[in-house]
């Protein structure tokens, strides 16, 4: 083999190795950068949180942003977890400690607890309504918003019954059922062959009965009754859609009339949103 050819092959191999190293560095990081980020994270804790029991749980590389993320925890604070981001050179980028101070960690904990509570019904295999399809939507949430959202004149999706974020106390153990009674919100999409106000009333009463029997309170319900999708995943446009139907209004006498009014109010709400676009 001629010398120029050997040199060309060698250059090609070196270039290929360089590309593989670069690709591996981008996808998985490297030990040197990991060590730099780990050292920087320890220095960050020493500088910012000296005298506390905060500790670094782990540090991982994210190929999505090409940075290292140190996850910080406290054994005495259920809402104290946050993360710190570092570059591959160990330079500080940002941290999420504000989510501890402003109450979002507490809000997420409470919402997760309420979600788990409602999932005991909505994810139960014995549930008489199908919640196993990829397009199925059935869950419960706590409505929690910051003061700025309540005061924003352009905010259209903040319910009056929502909990004020600033009222939450860090690390406080709340009665989730009591919060659910004040701000629990069920979002239910039910597939049914028959789309009618009567079927809507029957199914809403059924859900109220299930939640009452399980002693899982909620304050309001979003309810959509629609046809099942075809085998190819297509659906038609016929549906009944209701937003924020209150728990206290889900009782048999006059329910159909209240549903009719709620359907009109929901349609008007979406028409208003369309005009705002």
Over which residues does each language-model region extend?
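Exposed beta-strand-loop-beta-strand "reactive/processing" segments of non-cytosolic proteins
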Residues: 53-86
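Short glycine-rich, low-complexity/disordered patches
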Residues: 47, 51-62, 123-142, 214-230
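Short, Lys/Arg-rich N-terminal segment immediately upstream of the first membrane anchor
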Residues: 1-5
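Extracytoplasmic/luminal low-complexity segments enriched in Pro/Gly and acidic/polar residues
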Residues: 200-277
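Hydrophobic membrane-insertion alpha-helices, especially the h-region
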Residues: 6-25
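A short, surface-exposed beta-strand/turn
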Residues: 80-101
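Short, non-transmembrane alpha-helical segments in secretory-pathway proteins
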Residues: 27-57, 109-123, 202-212
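Non-cytosolic head/periplasmic domains of membrane-anchored proteins
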Residues: 95-195
């Amino acid at each position: 083999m001629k010398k120029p050819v050997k040199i060309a092959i060698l250059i090609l191999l070196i270039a290929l190795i360089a590309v593989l190293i670069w690709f591996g560095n981008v996808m998985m990081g490297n030990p040197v950068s990991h060590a730099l980020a780990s050292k920087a994270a320890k220095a960050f804790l020493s500088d910012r949180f000296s005298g506390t029991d905060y500790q670094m749980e782990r540090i991982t590389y994210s190929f999505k942003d090409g940075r290292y993320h140190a996850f910080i925890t406290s054994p005495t604070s259920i809402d104290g977890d946050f993360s710190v981001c570092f570059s591959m050179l160990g330079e500080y980028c940002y941290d999420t400690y504000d989510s501890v101070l402003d109450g979002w960690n507490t809000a997420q904990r409470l919402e997760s607890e309420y979600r788990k509570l409602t999932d005991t019904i909505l994810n139960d295999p014995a549930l008489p309504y199908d919640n196993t399809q990829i397009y199925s939507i059935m869950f419960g949430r706590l409505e929690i918003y910051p003061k700025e959202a309540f005061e924003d004149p352009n905010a259209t999706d903040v319910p009056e019954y929502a909990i004020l974020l600033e009222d939450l106390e860090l690390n406080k153990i709340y009665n989730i059922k009591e919060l659910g009674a004040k701000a629990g919100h069920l979002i239910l999409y039910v597939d049914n062959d028959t789309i009618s106000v009567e079927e809507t009333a029957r199914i809403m009463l059924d859900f109220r009965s299930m939640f009452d029997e399980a002693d899982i309170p909620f304050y309001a319900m979003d309810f959509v009754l629609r046809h099942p999708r075809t085998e190819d995943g297509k659906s038609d446009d016929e549906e009944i859609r209701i937003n924020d139907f209150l728990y206290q209004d889900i009782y048999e006498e006059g329910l159909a009339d209240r549903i009719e009014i709620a359907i009109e109010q929901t349609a008007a709400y979406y028409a208003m949103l369309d005009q705002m676009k």
